[in-house]
Amino acid sequence: MKNLIAELLFKLAQKEEESKELCAQVEALEIIVTAMLRNMAQNDQQRLIDQVEGALYEVKPDASIPDDDTELLRDYVKKLLRHPRQ
């Protein structure tokens, strides 16, 4: 029983570490996208936003991915492009 608990705690710690790594990657990408957008001319910024939103619109939904997840992704991309970090 102790071994099982120890193994579960170890797996939980691994998952937490993976989660932290993913969060750091997302934060880094947000910073990069924000910096790029801020350094672009307004018309170039708008062209990029239109291209990204167009690409997202053209992607066919995957039946294995819940609609809520797809909508969450689209909302987050829109927020990142239209209202970058301060």
From Swiss-Prot:
Q: Which Pfam families match?
A: Anti-adapt_IraP
Coiled coil located at which positions?
A: 1-36
Entry keyword 4Fe-4S: no
Record's subcellular location: Cytoplasm
Is Coiled coil included in the keywords of this UniProt record? yes
Q: Which GO terms describe its biological process?
A: cellular response to starvation
GO CC annotation terms, alphabetical: cytoplasm
- What quaternary structure, including any partners, is listed in this protein's UniProt entry? Interacts with RssB.
Its annotated function is as follows:
Inhibits RpoS proteolysis by regulating RssB activity, thereby increasing the stability of the sigma stress factor RpoS especially during phosphate starvation, but also in stationary phase and during nitrogen starvation. Its effect on RpoS stability is due to its interaction with RssB, which probably blocks the interaction of RssB with RpoS, and the consequent delivery of the RssB-RpoS complex to the ClpXP protein degradation pathway.
Name used for this protein in its record: Anti-adapter protein IraP
- This chain's source organism reads Escherichia coli O1:K1 / APEC
Which gene is transcribed and translated to give this protein? iraP
